[in-house]
Amino acid sequence: MVTGDKESSLMKKRNKRSHKRKREEDFERIDSLPWSSSIPIGEDDEGESFSTLFSGSGQLDGGFLSLEEIDEADYHLTLPTIESEITERKQSPEDDDDTNETVDEMIEGEEAEEDGEGRDDEDDEDDEETRKKKEKKAKRNKEKKKEKKKKKQKKINEAAKNQDASAVSCDGDDTVEEQVEEEEIPPEFSAWSSMRLHPLLMKSIYRLDFKEPTKIQKACFNVAAYQGKDVIGAAETGSGKTLAFGLPILQRLLDEREKVGKLYALKGEEAQKYAADGYLRALIITPTRELALQVTEHLENAAKNLSVKVVPIVGGMFSEKQERRLKEKPEIVVATPGRLWELMSAGEKHLVELHSLSFFVLDEADRMVERGHFRELQSILDLLPVTDKPNEGKTQTVKSNDTVLNVPKKKRQTFVFSATIALSSDFRKKLKRGSSKSKQSSSGEVNSIEVLSERAGMRDNVAIIDLTTTSILAPKIEESFIKCEEKEKDAYLYYILSVHGQGRTIVFCTSVTDLRHISGLLKILGLDVCTLFSEMKQRARLKSIDRFRASENGILIATDLVARGIDIKNVRTIIHYKLPHSAEVYVHRCGRTARAFADGCSIALIEPNETSKFYTLCKSFSMESVKIFPLDNSYMPAVRKRLYLARQIYEIERKGSRENADRTWLKKHAESMELELDDEESEEERVDNVRQRKATSARLNKLKEELSTLLSHPMQPKKFSGRYFAGVGVSTLMQNQFVELKKQKQAQMQIGGDIKRRKLVVINQNCIEPLQALRAGGNEMLKMKGQSAEKRRDIASLKKKRKEEKIGRRDQRRNQKKQRKLMASS
């Protein structure tokens, strides 16, 4: 402790000495300055003159020297600017590094002074060296400051340039800025230049490698983004409708963000009241969960680096997780009506506060207006703020719990999109005239596109963009059909999937019963099949879609749930196991292939009862003729043989699974009700049941073995002989197939198992896509001309037959009455 006190006292003494020495040096420097006689010599009250008080070196007469006249470089002086620099840097937090440097300089100066203690007899040369060092450091600091200021100014100028380039007027007056943007856009993306997208959006377009906008995107963007109109859009499937409404939404959000940034630079924190941060800006409603997730994925890809959050709200997932994501306050929400209304009715704050909602989108709107579907949509529409008389620029005070917000009231834009939108001529005229009010249905149901648009708050002078052609179908899709009996549909389906099993294929069914029947048969026949229908859980749905996307030659058997908007790449073939109930559903089914300028094939399996429906369907699309899908009937016996075994196996397994399900159901409910099941079977019956089970299992095993042997060999045509064939008649294709077959057998012997699906399926025929087979051999066509007369004859004969049956039944009833009367009278 004593030594510590001594050291502290010594340090104090040294500091005092250094301060004294510093003062003396300053006085000496001041005394050595040349003085001017700017002030006359006078005397004060005590009689002393100013010259005696402020006497210089004796070289010049006395007087004051103004600070402007002092040049510190001439006198080797440095002005004490350290404190002022520190205060300036405290105001600007970006210059923390400079403040640290100045503090280090101060510490170094003190250390240098401490080291110099005890050297009272030091020469003036050392002082000059330290001064020079300090001057050099001060100059360095000034240069660093200048460089940092230049960098800041450059950043500000660049930001201003970007803002000026993005804030292009809606009327297109700034031609110079457009030229600058066109020069910056790469030549392969030059088609986007006319749309005047925000620079950040253009970066997303480059990253996604979209070379040019689609027709619907180009037509909708200028109308929606720059003119601010509501849009009713219709275009063929796979035409990019998601970005047609997604790009205007992102463009407006980015423009508003820049405007708020400019206001913040002018007005400071007052500009925050003009921002709508933390509120829902766009609400997109889709009919299916899969479509909602797909739209979310597309928008997230487009808004990846834009700091715009997109959240899906769909059923089949935990609502708690979705509520957590809504607490992040996303700008865009993509939802299905059921789960959206569930969260809205529960009072979810982010979904209920819709005063800042700028966009309301209905995707696949024609599906939402079907009778009996989406009753929640009516309740959602009732919650939307009224937009009958929008006043742009006026502010609206909104009470939110404890705070009162001044939010700018803006026009809400409504987008209605689908591949098939049928608007009546009266409704089109009504929209053009601008009469917003119309007669709604007495029940209040949303049962048409017209009512849906009006209830959603569609404003006057709406833009109707209808890019559908008379055929409505995609231009590169090729239609075909196979005429067959109802029992033969399974055989022809298996023929297409095995003989032409290349590329992704979707098989559409009208019922879940048909779906389970087909998937069960095809799985027994060794095909890797995915299923998708509404009764599946959401996790199983997503797994099924992922499996289908992962397989290049995948097969998806689905109901019309998949027909709406789902975008799966490289779907080559669509098979209609049964025709849909409406032409709109047929369009959406076919729209899963031939998407985004690609080609595809559609095959319809037509039974006799569906011929008239198919004719009317083709005529509604203005088809002059339809190709008949080419079939090689020499392979059909082998197909039928395999299918016969598969059906027997399927029926046995189905019967057994039903019995087990019934047994477990009885046991479960008996246990829950605390009841004992009566075992009425005798021992003989039990023995018979055991024998029957053993016999069925033995038969099942035998059928499975027989089918596995057939599946282990490639499918052969009827006339082909595996034992005797002339060497001259063997083609090069067949020779290559035999070599490949030998390799497969060797691989099977090494593995010791059964290869589930083989590359070599058919002898003497290449495994090609159905589209290639259709182009190669589909010359036979069914012409639609002249079918109307045949159809009329069929209808007339059918009416005549029904009339005759009706007359016969009536005569029979009369005869029966007469007989009863005779019996009663006798």
From Swiss-Prot:
It catalyses: ATP + H2O = ADP + phosphate + H(+). The lineage of its organism: Eukaryota, Viridiplantae, Streptophyta, Embryophyta, Tracheophyta. A motif (Q motif) lies at residues 190-218. Residues 476-644 form the Helicase C-terminal domain. This is DEAD-box ATP-dependent RNA helicase 13. Belongs to the DEAD box helicase family. DDX24/MAK5 subfamily. Residues 94-128 have a biased composition (Acidic residues). Gene3D superfamilies: P-loop containing nucleotide triphosphate hydrolases. Residues 11-22, 133-154, 815-826 have a biased composition (Basic residues). Residues 49-58 have a biased composition (Polar residues). It comes from Arabidopsis thaliana (Mouse-ear cress). The gene is RH13.
